[in-house]
Curated annotation (Swiss-Prot):
GO terms for molecular function: ATP binding; glutaminase activity; metal ion binding; NAD+ synthase (glutamine-hydrolyzing) activity; NAD+ synthase activity. This is NH(3)-dependent NAD(+) synthetase. The lineage of its organism: Bacteria, Bacillati, Bacillota, Bacilli, Lactobacillales. Homodimer. It is an enzyme of class 6 (ligase). NCBIfam families: nadE, PRK00768.1. Catalyzes the ATP-dependent amidation of deamido-NAD to form NAD. Uses ammonia as a nitrogen source. It comes from Lactococcus lactis subsp. lactis (strain IL1403). Disulfide bonds: none annotated.
Amino acid sequence: MTLQDEIIKELGVKPVIDPKEEIRVSVDFLKDYLKKYPFIKSFVLGISGGQDSSLAGRLAQIAIEEMRQETADETYKFVAIRLPYGVQADEEDAQRALAFIQPDVSLTVNIKAAVEGQVAALNEAGIEVSDFNKGNIKARQRMITQYAVAGQYQGAVLGTDHAAENITGFFTKFGDGGADLLPLFRLNKRQGKALLAELGADPAIYEKVPTADLEEGKPGLADEIALGVTYNDIDDYTEGKVISEDAKAKIEAWWKKTQHKRHLPISVFDDFWK
């Protein structure tokens, strides 16, 4: 078995999907969790305005609505949270996403004060925080906020991790990589687009250039530039297709370099890192 085969098996990506079937798989997955743990009454998710949070958010809202219909329990809610750092340049995209998702509850929590407070405290301790490191603080502050909201709403936090993101480790450890459930896991980028199209999303949502937008010195830096490889190549790779040796080498290098992000904290019983 090649490394590509091993990765595809671990990620669970199918070479061809039926968008309607995959929508049902994700919705049922979320509902099954609520049925298993009846004390959980909400799903919480940060909404950026990009493809991934738009898709996960809409799937969560559908699951919650079906749970209310099936159980007659009106306490089930989906909570969408806008988590801007100051004034976000793509706020229009976020509002477009919220209009598509139609969440039960929509909150906005500006993380700038919390992030700047943390950076100031580190500066006082003699630590000069780099722009890249500060970007990770932003991602982790967003997850702190989501868990705080989930605690108030008896909720579980959803993540937006999917195959194209997971394979490259393109997420912040214990930031956007921290969540309770991952409804998009097994789907690559183009498959996520197909689900959004099936759900009737505005094409602007899934045609938007993907960006983490965490670094102030590189605002709106496209994921593909940061990774040095295109999502088209990543998607082809996860579907078992042949891609250029250069792209393949980059993808597999990212996979190996970021293995620690795909595991719980390492103990003496773990050997994946050796």
